[in-house]
Amino acid sequence: MALLLITRFTLQEAIRRRLFLAVIILSALLLLAFTILVSIAINFFLSNSNTVNNSTVSPQLYLLSSGVFLDILMIWLAYLLSSLLTIVMTAGMISAEVEAGTFAVIVPKPISRAEIVIGKWLGNALILSIYTAFLFFAFLAVIYWKTGYWPPQAFSALGTLELGTLALLGLTTLGSAFVPTIVNGAIALVLFIGAPTASIVQFVVQVISQVQSQALQNIATIINLIIPTDALWHGTSFSLLPSANVFPILNLSTNNFNTPFTSTQPVAPALLVWVAFYILVLPLIAVLRFQRRDL
């Protein structure tokens, strides 16, 4: 089947690219550096635990609460890495091949344009999803090893994280069918940065004025509909938190996580429906555009 053939070629091409190899090596080095730093910090803490023992928090609970913050910090880093890799790898998914003249050779053969787009989308989706899951479980495993904390909703967190990657992939697939590679990458990057920027502005205005601006909330909602990655990240951060009844035990408060980067509320079901529509429809629009595009 031509679709699976294109998918296999896309996977092989991604693996052969120096960019992907460099990202894998850098990710492994980052994971190693993180493991060493956390080990040093935890060992230093345990060797000086007499200070903590004189307080109301035991060393074990202190480590668990530290694990919560480390989970959010490192999975946020995994979210950034997978998102940036998505933009860099897929901004030229279609446009770069058109510019290089590759499709002029492939398309006359018995391979439909729809199979080319969907096959390339599927290949990139597979490799990006595997990379995201690898980072997710690698960081969680290190943190669990050193602190003993494992999120009770880890698989829900992974699910929303993967949805964010696929949503961004849908956006770059659509853009690659309409505009040149550099323009597509720039648009995706600006939108990706714009979503959390809107959240930060909304948070700052709310803190300063003590009043929630409806206009800013509407703008943030529109941006989250255009690119739902930031809203999905907030859902991921919620799933990384411990159960509500564990917060007092760990000497934590939900107020600690009401920030522009984290959330104490799950993803709204309506947003999940929109994201599913987004992930499926944007590549289909790219197919329709590619059907009419000159090669």
Task: Give, region by region, the residue ranges found by the protein language model.
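Pore- or pathway-lining transmembrane helices of multi-pass membrane proteins that form conduits
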Residues: 20-28, 181-199, 217-221
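Cytosolic juxtamembrane amphipathic/interface segments immediately preceding
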Residues: 5-13, 115, 259-263
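Secretory targeting signals
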Residues: 31-91, 117-188, 220
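Terminal transmembrane helical anchor/hairpin motif
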Residues: 37-68, 192-288
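Aromatic- and glycine-rich beta-strand/loop motifs that create alpha-glucan
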Residues: 1-28
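Helix-capping/transition residues at the boundaries of transmembrane alpha-helices
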Residues: 13, 95, 106-108, 168, ...
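Transmembrane alpha-helical segments in integral membrane proteins
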Residues: 77-98, 276-292
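Helix-loop-helix units of permease transmembrane domains in multi-pass membrane transporters
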Residues: 92-125
